Amino acid sequence: MKKAVLLSFLLCLALACTACAGGDMQPSPTPDAATEAPQDANLPQLPEDIRVDQNGVPVLNVYVQSEDKIDEMGLEEYLGGVLAGEMKNDWPEEALKAQAILARTFVLKFLMEKKSMYEGADISTDIREAQAYDAEGVNERIRAAVKDTRGMVACYQNEPIYAWFHAHSGGKTDTAENGLDYQQAAPYTQVTDGNESESAPQDAAQWSTQFTEAEVIQAAADAGLKLDGGIETVQAGAKDDSGRVGEILLNGQPVSANEFRIAIGSTKMKSTLLTHIAYSDGTLALSGRGYGHGVGMSQWGA
């Protein structure tokens, strides 16, 4: 792999806020030479409208969906709820730290590029725009993971990455272009061998499911393909370098496999890394490996 496209998830001290007194957020413990940002790195900055308290912690207006109100909370407090929402709080320490870094990266990228759909909020607990959130799931392990990675985000060329992750790679990660139909360059996403834990659930590593003809027709329509009449054939399109299918062919007509998966139910069709596809007597049978889009960090690999 060329060095130009190789990313070892640079852990920048990226939430330095030079516009405010005491604004530097130093991680604890101090990062070693393998992870700290280069001396000449242009570190990403918080938007100017984000307030930083006297301890250097960004303060966010968070719309809490379950309570239908906006709460003011420090970034690290918000991240605790996100981490508990995205990963089980009894998982290994290093896995929690990795997820915390990605969660913080997601927040910084969101604040830099987007606005919350909720008026007066910087971000929310609504998974339609942000990350899962579970304040009740926060325990000492969660707090420690957030504290020990304080200020750390994953960067590529001094910019926060799009912090994609998935549950299980099925043995191969994928690029954002293929795994997510992403239209912009994201060279830090690569096809690599997965390193999933042997303790991962069997139905995440390998899965099988079935769908009715009506479900397939509706999913195709939701994914942008309107079928006239019933279904005669269902086939897998070409595979990318990771082995994932880019398109599903319904009566010979292509539809994005990623969009079809979301439309038909991503908790049943768990990935596009298909190992079997067959249509007979009004039933679509699918089997595959992995859980999720396969882009970025595998949680069971972490």
Identify the meaning behind each predicted range.
Residues 1-302:
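Conserved, single-site charged/polar hotspot
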